[in-house]
Amino acid sequence: FKRLHETVDTCFSEDFINIIEKRCIDAAAANVGLNVHFSYTDNDKVIRESEWHFKTFDEYIELFTDYVDTEQMLKFSDSIMQVWVFPDNGINVGFVNGAECSRGTHIRAVRNEINNAISAYLLSKEKIDITPKNVDGKYSMFCTFHVNNPSYDSQTKECLTTVVEKFSNDSKYTFKVPDAFIKNVLKSEIVDIVIDWYKQKCEVEDQKTLRKLNRQAKTKIRNNDKFIDAN
């Protein structure tokens, strides 16, 4: 920067610096036990620096405590994945092999099983017919995966494309969200949120139907022939 007669501030925006620091935090979170140091300097002057080390991925999630209700968080894990879900609006925070990857087959595989289970439960127990797709936005998820030879839709590795059957190199491994975890989800506030959404949706549809019927009734009245006295 000295040779260019520039400073860090003129070359990098504050938003860019924040993104770089977040990448450092994410790298430490996805690689438990690794020390990651972030240093933002200008002409040897330290402007901002931080060091990150997580003993567990749970400690990373605790950074979001102002946003996440950890008491309502549900968790499961197996040989290739750790997953946490909680009532929310459908955000995904995911990692694959230590790199941030919040879209793709790993996210959909977990969500599909949860969504299908909630949809089937509501139809059976509450007589509520709601599609799995409409369940999707009622909870958020943190996850970290170790996928064998992962493939992505681009070099930025933002979306995993590896098919579920190839997640593990263990021929005996079968991807499945545990039944015990599903049972806990069905007892959670997530289901209540889905039911509330469905009821609100029905109320809106009923109001639309009522307004339509009122318009039709008014139209019929206006179109009636004027009364003609028989005398």
Model-derived features: positions:
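GHKL-family ATPase ATP-binding module
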Residues: 1-231
